[in-house]
Amino acid sequence: MLLLKKLSEAAGVSGCENEVRNILKEELKEYADFKTDALGNLLFEKKNKGKKPRIMLAAHMDEVGLMITSILKNGFLKFESVGGIDDRILVSKTVTIGPNKIKGVIGAKPIHRQDPKERENALKIKNLYIDIGAKDQEDAEKKVKIGDYACFDTEFEIFGENIVKGKALDDRIGCFVVAEILKRNYEVEICGAFTVQEEIGLRGSGVAAYQLKPDVAIVVEGTFASDVPGTKEEEYNTVLGMGPAVTTMDRSFIANKGMRDRVFEVAKKNNIPCQPRRTNLGGTDGGRIQSIGEGIPTIVISVPTRYIHSPVSVADINDINNTILLINSLILDYQERGV
């Protein structure tokens, strides 16, 4: 899990994925040839060129976060969200800002000073600020610039029984899975991309797929798990500990039926736990990849993850390992039977 720890703790808000990209290039330099395209996608080709079919693997490097929009006279920072973040979870959270990783705390008007009406309503992002301990605007401007990114400051840890917690598991968990697959050898062509700007509109994946021109694509995600108090069992999207989740449909994507059926067949044949992703909420790079060129048969396989798009997410190590096993088995099935 050392690589996943590095990936989780790296700063990589949409549009600023450099740190994540560098970690992956260093980790995988022995296994693949890399190219960074104009948008920032990290494209790869396995060093041992195989036969058809040409299989694309994709996982996005970016995470939701914040961007500094103004520096006030008293040294506090105003900000906007980058990607989908619930304003209600921001107060009192610690962040790191910009290339120098300046520490900050997200603050709000003290509850003791809030009137009854203010206390009844959830705080909006426009009412929040970041405190970096600056004396005034001049002091703050020495440390931070408008346009700097801020990401949550969260330590990756293993806790409980085979459970991990950390920030940005959507989708550093997918990057980790793809990295582990890249370390294996296959007789088919393996290409793919660690993509950028997924959280703000699936921007990188289409550019990547256009360049790679695969026969089929496998997108690896960290999807939300709703197996928590307050949600009825029949409304669970995915459940921790029940294996990778296979998407039928989300707001951007409808799975290739043949690929979806094949994934479940491969899982059953190899005794790998696997679950359907039950709701059609959210969107993934799969929606963009499948519509490139003449169309690319695509499947999205995800690791169930609680509390995504927040300062800390939770996932099951067994689900991560079973996702690696499932994708490995699926590639071997393509190697044996073709498309």
Question: Model segments located where?
Answer:
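N-terminal hydrophobic/helix-forming segments and targeting peptides
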Residues: 1-339
